[in-house]
Amino acid sequence: MTTVSMRDMLQAGVHFGHQTRYWNPKMKPFIFGARNGVHIINLEHTVPMFNEALAFISNVASKKGKVLFVGTKRAAGEAIKESALSCDQFYVDHRWLGGMLTNWKTVRQSIKRLKELESQSVDGTFDKLTKKEALMRTRELEKLEKSLGGIKNMGGLPDVLFVIGADHEHIAIKEANNLGIPVVAVVDTNSAPDGVNYIVPGNDDAMRAIRLYTSSVAAAAKAGRGQDLAVQAEQDGFVEAE
């Protein structure tokens, strides 16, 4: 089972919150104290809470569930995309479009258009167009890929959201809440943990901390998927009993 230790978190700077003047009182139970005007997060809480979240994600993946990684802050985007791709899951790394979950019907149409344009770009259709028309379609393709590329093969709503930065991604969290989709989120000392089913109190800005979260979630999803494949193989008669 994928787990993260206290040492891992200390080395990544997970315990460094925001300046005390920007704190959200709802995070008080998870704050150890303050140092040089910066809140220190109590990792005695974070370690078990994150490991519980990882176990949940692994369980979702073991049942063929879809994990949607969400992190549109500049510091998070790259790690979110890399980690989601590494475990064959899905991501939003650029901008959360309002209605991405709650208006899935419309989003599905946009994904259909994205796939049409992708086909046209490789089957020679673009070459037959005027220069202006080809440029317009190329721009449309790039725009759609940027906003929907990470969910184009999701094939329906996700089974869990993994979010870096609860305050920054509050719209995504609210949409998930409206649809009853569980939310795992990293919540810093300046944020409210409202609407988050699995709270991970921790720094949501430092690259090392973000990479620790995303790589751990990817590993948990992979482990869960591995269990699913092992069960499937056994059912298909590929695994011989000793």
UniProtKB/Swiss-Prot annotation:
InterPro entries: Ribosomal_uS2 (IPR001865), Ribosomal_uS2_bac/mit/plastid (IPR005706), Ribosomal_uS2_CS (IPR018130), Ribosomal_uS2_flav_dom_sf (IPR023591). One of its GO terms (cellular component) is cytosolic small ribosomal subunit. It holds the Pfam family Ribosomal_S2. GO terms for biological process: translation. One of its GO terms (molecular function) is structural constituent of ribosome. Keywords: Ribonucleoprotein, Ribosomal protein. CDD domains: RPS2. The keyword Hydrolase does not apply. HAMAP family: Ribosomal_uS2_B. Belongs to the universal ribosomal protein uS2 family. This is Small ribosomal subunit protein uS2. The gene is rpsB.
